[in-house]
């Protein structure tokens, strides 16, 4: 079943909200698109204005009773978000590639133990959260970096 058919079958509505920003890469595009894409990632990770705006939106979502997943591709970005969001959100759970089986199990248990009425946010890399991760409470997705192919979003 393709992503559109799956979305149509779900008992909830999908809404995409685009947040225009003032971000400007400020550099010329080179001939190696992969290198340029990685450079763009780093510029976005380092953009404090952009990151602050994302964190404000996440905190607002949690206060509105949402259970968001913040998705990035950079561990450094996860660390930055964790540092800011931990001051405002009671439960910040970070999931990233390279976590051992024991650590993954510990984080899964921690997630399961968070009461529904308590605010929480999951920060994760796409590589970790891809196939096989399921959390029925997730209802909001923040894509903090551009994606380079459609399959990333479909998952």
Regions found by a protein language model. Give the residues of each.
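Post-DEXD/H (motif II) to motif III coupling segment of the RecA-like Helicase ATP-binding lobe
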Residues: 1-17
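Short, basic/glycine-rich phosphate-binding loops at helix/coil junctions
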Residues: 12-40, 84-89
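Conserved SF2 helicase motif VI
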Residues: 148-155
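Short, surface-exposed connector motifs at secondary-structure boundaries
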Residues: 61-68, 89-91, 136-139
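Conserved catalytic network of the ASCE P-loop NTPase/AAA+ motor domain
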Residues: 8-10, 60-63, 86, 112-117, ...
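Conserved helicase ATPase core of P-loop NTP-dependent helicases/translocases
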Residues: 69, 79-80, 89-130, 152
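Conserved interdomain hinge at the start of the Helicase C-terminal
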Residues: 29-73, 79-84
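A short beta-strand element within the Helicase C-terminal
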Residues: 123, 131-146
């Amino acid at each position: 079943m393709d992503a559109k058919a799956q979305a149509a079958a779900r008992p909830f509505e999908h809404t995409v909200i685009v947040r225009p920003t003032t971000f400007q890469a400020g550099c010329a595009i080179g001939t190696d698109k992969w290198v340029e894409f990685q450079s763009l990632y780093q510029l976005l990770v380092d953009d404090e204005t952009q990151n602050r705006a994302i964190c404000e939106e996440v905190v607002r979502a949690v206060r509105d009773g949402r259970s968001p997943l913040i998705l990035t591709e950079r561990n450094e970005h996860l660390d930055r978000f964790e540092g800011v969001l931990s001051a405002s959100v009671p439960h910040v759970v970070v999931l990233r590639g390279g976590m051992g089986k024991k650590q993954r199990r510990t984080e899964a248990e921690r997630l399961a133990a968070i009461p529904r009425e308590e605010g929480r946010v999951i920060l994760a890399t796409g590589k970790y959260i891809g196939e096989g991760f399921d959390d029925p409470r997730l209802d909001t997705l923040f894509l903090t970096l551009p994606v380079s192919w459609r399959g990333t979003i479909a998952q």
